[in-house]
UniProtKB/Swiss-Prot annotation:
It comes from Candida albicans (strain SC5314 / ATCC MYA-2876) (Yeast). Keywords: Metal-binding, mRNA processing, mRNA splicing, Nucleus, RNA-binding, Spliceosome, Zinc, Zinc-finger. Belongs to the BBP/SF1 family. Gene3D superfamilies: 6.10.140.1790, K Homology domain, type 1, Zinc finger, CCHC-type. GO terms for biological process: filamentous growth of a unicellular organism; mRNA processing; regulation of mRNA splicing, via spliceosome; RNA splicing. Residues 153-236 form the KH domain. InterPro entries: BBP-like (IPR045071), KH_1_KHDC4/BBP-like (IPR055256), KH_dom (IPR004087), KH_dom_type_1_sf (IPR036612), SF1-HH (IPR032570), SF1-HH_sf (IPR047086), Znf_CCHC (IPR001878), Znf_CCHC_sf (IPR036875). This is Branchpoint-bridging protein.
Length: 455
C-alpha cells in the first residue's frame, strides 16, 4: 500500500498549557534561608502530610510578603502570576466594582485584595499548625491580628419571600445572642435591608459605614480566632438552610420563636396533650341534640318549650326524655314534718255527754276593793243612786299559747274533769243545807251589816 501524494503526519508539538503557576519543576524550594523538599519520598501518615503542607504554605506566604516589603514592590508583582502574559490560555479574573471610603479613597484595589487574602490564609494556617504541630514556631514577620472579620452573604435575591433578618435576630434579639454565645464570635447584620426605611444607621455603631449600607445583605462576623469564625459561619448556614428547605407548615424554627415571643409578652397559652379517653367521656356527658324531637312541630334540635309554634300550652304527650331535668335550687332543711292532726271526736249521743264535753265559761274576776280615801265611804246605795261610778271592766284574758291539737285536747279534757268534780261537790253541799233548814223551820239569818254604812 503506497502513500503517494501524502506526507506522514509527525507527532504533535509538545506544548504545555501555561497557567499562572507555570514554571520549571524544582526539586527544592528556597524561602529565604530555608530550603524545602517539593517531592515527598518517605513514608508519611496523612496527619504528617497535612502538617508538612501547612508548614510549607505558611513559609511561602511569609516569603512573598517579606520580599514585597523589602523591595518596595506590589504583592501582585512578586507572585508567580505576574510573570505570565495574558494570552488566550490565561486571563485574569475581572475586578469587582470599586468601593470607596468616606474620604474618597478606594478600598478594594487589587493589591489590597491580594494582601488581605494572603494574610487571612496564613492566619488560618498558623492557627491550625499551632494546634497540630508540636513545638511549632510561628514566622518572624507574623503578627497575629487583634480580630478577624468575615462576611457571610445571605441569599436574599434568590429567596425574596423569606424574612432572613427577622429569623436571624429572633424575638428581642435572643437568636442572635444565642449564636454569639455558642460560637464566641460577634455577629452583626449589615447591608441592604438590615435597617428599616426611615431609620438612621447610627444605632448599629461606628462600624456601619456607607460602604456596608450599600453592600448586599450579609452577616458581619468578628472574632479573635478563625475557629470561632468558622463555627459562627456553620451555625448561621444551618439557620439559612432550615429557612430555605423547610416545607410549608413545618417550619419548627418559626414555631419556637413565636412561642418564645409569647412567653416574653406573657400571652402564652399552654396546650395539653390530646387524651382520647377524656374526650370520649366528655362527649358522652353532653346531650345529643339530634335525638331531641319537638312534640309540636316535629323538628329535631329543640324541645316543645322552646318551639316557635308554642302558644304557651304544653303538650300532654311530652315525655320526660325530651325535657331537660331542672335542678331545684331551694335550700333543703333537715326539720322533720309536723305530726298529723288528731282524728275528730265522735259525735255525742246524749245531753250529758254534750255538757261534759263543752266546758263552761270561766267566772269573771272579782272587782278590786276601792280604798277609803278614793271611794269616800261609798255604799251600795251610792252605787245604786249613781253617785259613784262603777269600776272599769277587767282586761281581757291573754290569748292561750299556741300548742298542738293533741296537747290542747288533753288539757281541755283535764279541765272538764276538774270542773265536773267541783260542780258535783257544790251541788251536794247545797242539797244538804236546804234539807237541814227545811227540817228546823228557822229562816236563815240575814248577813251582818257592813261597817261602812253610816248611822
Amino acid at each position: 500500500m503506497s502513500n503517494r501524494g501524502r506526507q506522514p503526519s509527525g507527532p504533535p508539538p509538545s506544548r504545555k498549557r501555561e497557567t499562572k503557576w507555570s514554571g520549571k519543576p524544582k526539586r527544592y524550594a528556597n524561602f529565604g534561608a530555608q530550603s524545602f523538599d517539593t517531592v515527598i519520598t518517605g513514608h508519611l501518615t496523612q496527619e504528617q502530610l497535612d502538617a508538612y503542607q501547612r508548614y510549607f504554605r505558611i513559609e511561602e506566604i511569609s516569603n512573598f510578603l517579606s520580599v514585597a516589603k523589602q523591595q518596595h514592590k506590589s504583592i501582585v508583582d512578586v507572585l508567580p502570576s505576574a510573570k505570565v502574559d495574558e494570552t488566550d490560555h490565561y486571563k485574569r479574573d475581572p475586578s469587582p466594582p470599586p468601593k470607596y471610603d468616606k474620604n474618597g479613597n478606594r478600598t478594594n484595589t487589587r493589591e489590597r485584595r491580594v494582601t488581605e487574602a494572603l494574610e487571612k490564609e496564613r492566619h488560618e494556617l498558623v492557627e491550625l499548625a499551632a494546634s497540630s504541630i508540636k513545638n511549632y514556631m510561628i514566622p518572624s514577620n507574623y503578627r497575629r491580628p487583634s480580630r478577624t472579620v468575615e462576611r457571610l452573604y445571605v441569599p436574599v435575591k434568590d429567596y425574596p419571600d423569606i424574612n432572613f433578618v427577622g429569623f436571624l435576630i429572633g424575638p428581642r434579639g435572643n437568636t442572635l445572642k444565642k449564636l454569639q454565645e455558642d460560637s464566641g464570635a460577634r455577629l452583626q447584620i449589615r447591608g441592604k435591608g438590615s435597617v428599616k426605611e426611615g431609620k438612621s444607621s447610627d444605632g448599629f455603631g461606628s462600624s456601619q459605614t456607607g460602604t456596608d449600607i450599600q453592600d448586599d445583605l450579609h452577616v458581619l462576623i468578628t472574632a479573635d480566632s478563625p475557629l470561632k469564625i468558622s463555627k459562627a459561619v456553620k451555625l448561621v448556614n444551618e439557620i439559612i438552610d432550615k429557612l430555605i428547605f423547610s416545607p410549608q407548615g413545618m417550619n419548627f424554627m418559626k414555631r419556637d420563636q413565636l412561642k418564645e415571643l409569647a412567653v416574653l409578652n406573657g400571652t402564652l397559652r399552654e396546650t395539653k396533650p390530646f387524651d382520647p379517653e377524656a374526650h370520649e367521656k366528655k362527649q358522652q356527658q353532653q346531650m345529643d341534640i339530634t335525638k331531641i324531637v319537638c312534640k309540636i312541630c316535629g323538628n329535631i334540635g329543640h324541645i316543645a318549650r322552646d318551639c316557635k309554634q308554642n302558644n304557651g300550652k304544653r303538650p300532654l304527650d311530652d315525655n320526660a326524655e325530651n325535657e331537660p331535668t331542672t335542678i331545684n335550687k331551694k335550700a333543703r332543711t333537715d326539720v322533720p314534718p309536723p305530726p298529723p292532726p288528731p282524728p275528730p271526736p265522735a259525735p255525742p249521743s246524749s245531753s250529758t255527754e254534750i255538757s261534759k264535753q263543752v266546758p263552761p265559761p270561766p267566772p269573771p274576776p272579782p272587782p278590786p276593793a276601792p280604798s277609803a280615801a278614793a271611794s269616800g265611804f261609798a255604799t251600795t246605795e251610792n252605787y245604786k243612786q249613781g253617785l259613784v261610778p262603777p269600776p272599769p271592766p277587767p282586761p281581757p284574758p291573754p290569748p292561750p299559747p299556741v300548742r298542738s291539737a293533741l296537747v290542747n285536747f288533753e288539757n281541755n279534757s283535764k279541765v272538764l274533769l276538774t270542773k265536773e268534780k267541783e260542780e258535783s261537790g257544790s251541788s251536794e253541799l247545797k242539797n244538804t243545807g236546804e234539807s237541814s233548814s227545811s227540817s228546823s223551820g228557822v229562816p236563815p239569818s240575814p248577813p251582818p251589816p257592813s261597817s261602812n254604812v253610816p248611822r
